[in-house]
Amino acid sequence: MEMTDPRNISIEEYDYPLPDERIARHPLAERDACKLLCYKPGQAPEDHIFSELPALLEPGTMLIYNNTRVINARLRFTKDTGAAIEIFCLEPDCPADYAQSFASTASCSWNCLIGNSKKWKEGVLTMPLEVKGVKFDLHATRTSAPGTPGQTVRFDWNAPEVSFSEIISAAGEIPIPPYLNRRSESSDSTDYQTVYSHIEGSVAAPTAGLHFTPALLGRLDEAGIERREVTLHVGAGTFRPVSADKIGDHDMHSEFIAVDRDFIADLADAIDAGRPIAAVGTTSVRTLESLYHIGVLMAEGRWTGELPQWTPYEPANGDMAASEALRAVVAYLDKTGDSTLLAHTRIIIAPSYRYRIVGSMVTNFHQPASTLLLLVSAFIGPEWRQVYDHALSAGYRFLSYGDACLFTR
């Protein structure tokens, strides 16, 4: 079945009034005490508490979440002139592999955003540090010409016993969302991480996962819910507003995903067995749906390493069964000898998109006129507005530290 091209959608159709006081500036003291709005198309919204999730999912559900961990991506340097320069690390450049970059013990370079860039046209920035009892200087050098917001910065330090991961953990700040309108606080280092995060690389949290606690994970296990992991490193583009009038003029940001071969095989088996597939957060949704289209491209010999944003809407994308597409990924990995799929995705999920993998999703309430709201609308239809109106009238808290939804199709 061919999908309708959504490029003519006007983002204004997905705007809604969000009073500032409804934006949660901090999380609740108990993560799983937040509200959970449950909705299935054609039914009325139901109000629950997040801790009730095990009883709201069908036994046998495969629940898939994003194990990425937010890094302390903001590094603040001060020039000799007193000018403050902020370097926001986005993704590794050399080495390009996240794990290798974090393990570097002398130098590495990153693609960055630079705050107060006009004050740093040349020269080396220096930050004195002490990590693990070792005193040294961290140096930052621009390796691309000034003039554009995105820049490549090389970091150097003379402390071979200290890794770059340890440096940013000690010297950096957690990059909380700009719409919170506050500086990061010490509590954000814990609050803005999921309890199951362990793969470093994100500059924003997969916020639907913030509601889980170790005790809740245990109760999910007891309820017969199978928990599995994928990795998508969330980029700063997740906060970038849609500035174009039409979705077709919006350039979707690229994000890195890593998915184990054995999980992909198990997911194909679960789909064939008719088991419910639930995703925690839009990042897991984008990863799982990307897997399908990557599999189609691999089967057709058209895979290049990155999934373009409009591929799902092309007639040539075919109508392959979900499990068949997933097994095409497994076959590709077996042929290359890789145990993990490493890829980038630019997929945009918008109304008319046909979901291939995900049957339920846990997600927060998203910003007006955002691509994440398009993803939700593609899942539950135009009733998203009814659901959001209910949440606003019922006192739900919005955005990253806010309440959650459980949508089922």
Give residue ranges: language-model regions.
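Surface-exposed, charge/polar-rich loops and edge strands
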Residues: 2-409
